[in-house]
Amino acid sequence: MNHQERILIYGRLGKNPDLRYTRKQEPVCQFTVAENIEGESSPRWHRVVVWGKQAELCTVYLKKGSPIFVQGQNFDREFTTDEGEKKQYRELNADNLGFL
């Protein structure tokens, strides 16, 4: 399943950004964002992935608790565990960030 939708969220980082590099030395940063939705008792959590120069800037300007705007596409990802069980998760592939 690879469902895609474009979204814009505002929230706060749940932990410090994690910067890594692909085999081709392309920077990729991952972090989670907690978005408070009016009428909901607990925040909605988003897994965010950022690529390229923006990924490197995330580790400079962001830390746990930082407010941020994120715009991008949601992707439903699927993987198989070591036990053979199929699992899914949603990931926001960010193309526009607003450091606040």
Spell out what each predicted region is.
Residues 1-100:
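Single-stranded nucleic acid-binding surfaces, predominantly the OB-fold ssDNA-binding core
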